[in-house]
Amino acid sequence: MKIFSLFGVVFLSLFFTSCSTKQTDLKTVEKVDLERYLGTWYEIARYEHSFQKDCKNVKANYSLREDKKIQVVNSCTKISTNEFKDAKAIAYSVDETNSKLKVSFFRPFYGDYWILDLDKDYKYVIIGTPSKEYLWILSREKIMNDELLNKLLEKITSLGFDKSKLIYTIQE
């Protein structure tokens, strides 16, 4: 039940927010190969929200379900207690590009998960929402070199996100 409350409250607000998404000029990548996208991603940075407060070692794991939807397992270690937390969700692609997903931690509420930038070798990804309230930089590695991180910070700025709002994730 603690897991539900840790990740739950703000995920609900994410879903309510994205249900009323306004028109946006935010562009996603042209195409995502879901098979290559699956697996473990480590969070490098994010916009702060209560469902991830006090979290370190944040990662997301994506796997394909039998029904062709995506199983999402987000996890972290609480900094203050060193307690492991996780939250499970289901995602599906809204079109053939696979760059716009809908994710639900609490059905029937689904939130936007847009892939805004993706390395050709699937080593890093920028994920955001059309409302620009949510933003994540993820990597296949726990640590990202400064040169690449600076490149991605320039990219998020060009997309209209405020890089000063980013929280950098502790990865051990």
Task: Give the location of each predicted region.
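Low-complexity, intrinsically disordered short peptide segments enriched in small/polar/basic residues
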Residues: 6-7, 29
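Positively charged n-region of N-terminal signal peptides that target proteins for export
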Residues: 1-5
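A beta-rich soluble binding module of mature secreted/lumenal proteins
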Residues: 19-172
